[in-house]
Amino acid sequence: MKETTAESTIQLKPNHSYGIDLLKFLALLLIFNSHIDIAYGSYRALATGGAIGDVLFFFCSGFTLFLRPTNSISEFPNWYKKRISRIFPSVFAVAIIRCLFFDTHDDIITIIISWNDWFIPCIMMYYVIIYIIGVYARQYIKHIIIGISVIGAVYFAIESQNIPYNMYGNTYLKWILFFNFMLMGAKMGICFPKKTESLTKLLIQAFAALVLYYVFYFIGQRSTSDLRYIQFISYIPLFILVQRLFMIGEHPKAQAVFMRKRVFPFIAFIGGLCLEVYLVQYYLITDRLNHLFPLNILLIFAAVVITAYFARCLARIIRQTFQTEPYNWREVVKMY
């Protein structure tokens, strides 16, 4: 990755993937968009992209985790402790906000398991598995991805008998398949940096993969015949799409656009709030502003981002409270 010296762009940090920053930003936008169906009113079909956002987030997690080697299983407790200290202060912070402003009171067990939501338990389980793979099977990641895909195909063949079936909906199939995206991110992290390809070619491939993903998904998901099995094929272009988006984000020509001083701070700030936005968005999405459509979407997004930022600040205070060092207030309010 070439270092950019132009005054209009930010100063590059060595060994930092700015493509990951872009993917986190895209993941947040897609996850948020998929949850605001009631705010779209008559245009609810536009509330899509949640699965793409989820797998982008898992890809980013796998990538950053494998940038640092995992050498010994004895190091796992301290390694896992760092994951806990990153995620659960935000979970507790959002629980406090829910209690103070949304009159929602949960017991500690409900809070720890994240209010019966799938995402936090899923990623905490992923951390355990991926660490073991990092220690004992790092060189077999491709084989593991293939094996998980086969398991997912068998699971899909059994579960899809229940029509209609959404493989990216409320099903354990996505727990199986989405782990492959974390593994793909880990594989890319091991191989980082990669050789640059044509940006035009990458954009065309990403667009084609996006179209194929939706074609296979919608045909299969809405079919009551054997065509429903086509839905599983959507997993393949989704895999390609994530990889190509990462390669686009790492391309110097793309970085010349999104790494401008007036653009990148916004991308980094929003992308850095991905976890907190996921946790707080449910309590701020409303249809009371639908008469302002499409302005209501922007207003809700702004409210979610502001609340997520305060949740992250509170999470950092909680985290620092249990450390021996003095409070670092600059770190608490840091934007990105």
Kindly give the residue locations of the regions a language model identified.
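Extracytoplasmic catalytic-loop and juxtamembrane helix elements of membrane-embedded
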Residues: 107-112, 170, 226-227
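Alpha-helical transmembrane segments and terminal signal-anchor/GPI-anchor hydrophobic tails
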Residues: 172-179, 193-303
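Membrane-cytosol interface segments of multi-pass membrane proteins
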Residues: 1-155, 160-161, 195-207, 254-269, ...
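Long hydrophobic alpha-helical segments that form multi-pass transmembrane helix bundles
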Residues: 150-191, 195
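Short glycine/serine- and small hydrophobic-enriched flexible loop segments
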Residues: 64-67, 134, 186, 190, ...
